[in-house]
Amino acid sequence: MASPGSSPFSPEEIATEGLKPEEYDDIVQRLGRHPNRAELGMFGVMWSEHCCYKNSRPLLSQFPTEGKHVLVGPGENAGVVDLGNGLQLAFKVESHNHPSAVEPFQGAATGVGGILRDIFTMGARPIAVLNSLRFGDLDDARTRRLFSGVVAGIAHYGNCVGVPTVGGEVYFDPAYTGNPLVNAMAMGLMETAEIVKAGASGVGNPVLYVGSTTGRDGMGGASFASAELDATSEVEDRPAVQVGDPFLEKSLIEACLEAFQTGAVVAAQDMGAAGLTCSTAEMAEKGGVGIDLDLDLIPNRETGMVPYEYLLSESQERMLFVAEKGREQELIDIFHRWGLQAVVAGSVIAEPIVKIRFQGEVAAEIPATALSDNTPIYKREVLAEPPEYVQKAREWSCDRIPPGTAEGIEIQGKLNSWSDILLQLLQVPTIASKRWVYRQYDHQVQNNTVVLPGDADATIVRLRPVAHQETPDQGVDSKTAVAATIDCNSRYVYLDPYEGAKMTVAEAARNLSCVGAEPIAVTDNLNFGSPEKPIGYWQLAEACRGLSEACRHLQTPVTGGNVSLYNETFDADGQPQPIYPTPVIGMVGLVPDLTKTCVQGWQADGDLIYLLGIPLDVQSDLVTLGATEYLASIHHQVAGEPPHADLDLEAQVQATCRHGIQQGWLHSAHDCAEGGVAVALAESCISGQRGADIQVPTGSNRWDQVLFGEGGARIVISVSATHQAAWESYLQEHLPQYWQQIGTVTTPNSELTLTTNVHQTLIKVRIEEATQRWAQAIESKLA
């Protein structure tokens, strides 16, 4: 243990690096001496939650990570799954929350750049980007600035680098006012015999630094991402935000993929969080070797840089390679040809340490495992009972809001018809059209995007040989495709982390099934508040338990992901305001025949409309008003128990939907999520620009629960009358009691009507008006 007063650093200096006093003592014990300034910084970033997962690692161990498609699981730059026919898919999701809160454009842009590097570092050519975004209330000026800046940053980087942004989700809630969430997911295609991994090997092999130069931008970004934001963050933490160059990244992609084809690359690691420190430590530790690096050889863009700055810089578009000895010049020539930096900056050594040299002296010398694997782990106690806010929320019942009649519901002395309520929900930014967002993205570059953003419940990207990805007119005869979605209902998770997390996985799988894709694997991004607070850790632990159970049940193993904790800000009174717990799930699936898939909009007049899942006339605790968008937006109450996931029913419903699509019976499929059945029907009307005539069984004393209740593993689908007999025969055999024919598709630009079987009209809205309200909701707030 360090003796009092013996440290060359003050408690404030140690705390600035994100280290606790006991962690500093641990460092001294491991080194047998006090660290120097550079070493202190290295430990600070590598022992941050962002890099070492010291609070979350014990919880992540329960995730299923193996499956028939999984080739690479957690621990590498990205997960990899086998798609068949010699093709593999690398995919991963990662957060850039704190940087985007401080500098939204660059924060979001470099988030895209970073996740793309994780993909092509594995040897995969990036084929698509998705994102999950969360902001505060759009009536707030700062929220509008953050929202506009983040979307512009994503568009700038993705469009310039030539990778399509094909889908995602955007949520708005006051819980994210101080701390927005920016999660970026990327996918890449490969057909290599050997996946490029990060573990260094071969004593004497040269270590190459390639890509851009090193500057002082992004200093200590990993530590910054592992602490709460406060009122000074937008000014004081701005230097921790990186600055990206998508054009340079495009060259880096091509150079790296060309270099990998030579067979001269032994290992590769991108320089993301913690920069040179992380890349050297992780490569050494994973390979069981050491790395000797000379900072004097590192190309820099600023003068007078010291080891601390070199090692903690998070300048973008940089990579570290281990090359076969004697073939380094072959690789250097490739990078120079692409206009990039490439130098031999060190070598692999037998002693498992990270040795850093500067101006002829050893600037740092640390065991690799102390930085990368044998890091502090905190096994915290989980609350034995749900916290008070959850117990109070569970006391809520439908009696807290007026019962309503077939005509509508009285709110604050005024009768609101169910038609009025539906139109109001369509204007809620979380539900409303996201066209303002995705019209800024180039979603068709590479010519493989099968379904455009907003047209279906998941995106679909055609699979072509890697050699043809950059040539739009070649390899187009392939019928196989990959589908992807990214999802989370954070209000569910806030009110019940366990059930909410299960529902998140179920919804992601349901979205894939709605386009005919078989879900095969998951990447997760766990966005939570401080784990050092009992409630925050309970939320994290319960959510991980729910994710694990759902992934096992639906056979979607976790291949990797990201943990982003300390997503909290302080209000004017100095009280911490954590975000809603937000475990975002990115899920990928296989589409066997892209000519047999589904969009969410009605396709033909006279098609029959079915509801899969819990029927409308069945009272079930799987369908609830608790935690719904209706309760929050119309009654301004965040309360109640969210719907519980019946994973057996989910699997049955999803398999039935996929089979119907593959048989060519289904014309459309759309899952019932925020806003329940009524909103799902309206969205299908808007997307297809056709009306629908729906019959709703009578007998309910809660029409709002029938119309706007959520849950129940529900999917709204449409089928041609010519396939009715075959479809219903299949339903009777494989999904008895969990399907219902509820109506028909009507003529273009007509009306959505929901009528009881005693001829009471519950909802009657013109498609033109519904479309206008839905389409203009976000744009009108930004005008």
UniProtKB/Swiss-Prot annotation:
It comes from Acaryochloris marina (strain MBIC 11017). CDD domains: PurL_repeat1, PurL_repeat2. Mg(2+) 1 binds at residues 94, 562. This is Phosphoribosylformylglycinamidine synthase subunit PurL. Keywords: ATP-binding, Cytoplasm, Ligase, Magnesium, Metal-binding, Nucleotide-binding, Purine biosynthesis. The active site is at 50, 96 (proton acceptor). Monomer. Part of the FGAM synthase complex composed of 1 PurL, 1 PurQ and 2 PurS subunits. Pfam families: AIRS, AIRS_C, FGAR-AT_linker. Belongs to the FGAMS family. Gene3D superfamilies: PurM-like C-terminal domain, PurM-like, N-terminal domain. Pathway: Purine metabolism; IMP biosynthesis via de novo pathway; 5-amino-1-(5-phospho-D-ribosyl)imidazole from N(2)-formyl-N(1)-(5-phospho-D-ribosyl)glycinamide: step 1/2. ATP binds at residues 53, 92, 524, 561. Its main location: cytoplasm. Disulfide bonds: none annotated.
